[in-house]
């Protein structure tokens, strides 16, 4: 961690927050060639006490529009490349007929957005994968085998490490009280 004696008076870009979102911003700014980037967080690096510190890290790739689906797939691949992702598949379960109709539409969206592996499961198929679910009370599920779980804090650290190597500076225990 940097000390106050090296704290810059100015920066071209300041990112507030060193969780997943802030570290991702810093990483992508560095990847795009941006220099003079500083990341500040009021908490310790990288378990800052914000959302990243207690996020479950579930990554479901199929979203309601193409851009969000592409972003989720990109994130999955990025975290996997850092070793911070565990592919275990993701199942969304329908307990109502309306939800089941929604999951059928979601599968169609996924296919049109490039998530070809998504599949609709019968109640029995859901129960065979998740024995805690009673097949008698559900309509079915939507399953994507390449969905999974990211270690959010490790992913933030991995992106920060790459950003640091590109010259981004990180300062923990640094609260932002005003912006000029």
Annotate the PLM regions.
Residues 11-38:
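N-terminal Rossmann-like FAD-binding beta1-loop-alpha1 element of flavoenzymes
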Residues 55-129:
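Dinucleotide-binding Rossmann-like beta1-alpha1 core, especially the glycine-rich loop
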Residues 142-180:
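Helical element adjacent to the flavin cofactor pocket in flavoenzyme catalytic cores
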Residues 49-56, 131-133:
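Short, flexible, mixed-charge acidic loops at enzyme active sites
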Residues 1-11:
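A short, basic/flexible loop-to-alpha-helix module at the beginning of a structural domain
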Residues 43-45, 126, 159:
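Short beta-to-alpha linker loops that shape the active-site pocket of alpha/beta-hydrolase fold enzymes
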Residues 35-36, 116, 169:
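Residue-level detector of anion-binding/catalytic polar loops
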Residues 30-52:
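Glycine-rich FAD pyrophosphate-binding loop
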């Amino acid at each position: 961690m940097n000390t106050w004696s090296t704290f810059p008076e100015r920066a071209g870009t300041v990112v507030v927050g060193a969780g997943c979102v802030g570290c991702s911003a810093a990483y992508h700014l560095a990847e795009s060639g941006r220099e003079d980037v500083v990341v500040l967080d009021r908490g310790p690096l990288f378990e800052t006490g914000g959302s990243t510190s207690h996020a479950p890290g579930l990554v479901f790739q199929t979203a309601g529009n193409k851009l969000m689906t592409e972003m989720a797939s990109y994130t999955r691949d990025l975290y996997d490349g850092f070793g911070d992702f565990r592919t275990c598949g993701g199942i969304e379960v329908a307990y109502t007929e309306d939800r089941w109709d929604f999951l059928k539409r979601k599968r169609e969206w996924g296919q049109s957005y490039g998530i070809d592996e998504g599949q609709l499961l019968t109640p029995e198929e859901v129960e065979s994968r998740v024995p805690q679910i009673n097949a008698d009370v559900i309509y079915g599920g939507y399953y994507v085998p390449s969905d999974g779980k990211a270690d959010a804090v490790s992913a933030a650290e991995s992106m920060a490490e790459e950003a640091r190597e590109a010259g981004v500076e990180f300062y923990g225990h640094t609260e932002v009280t005003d912006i000029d």
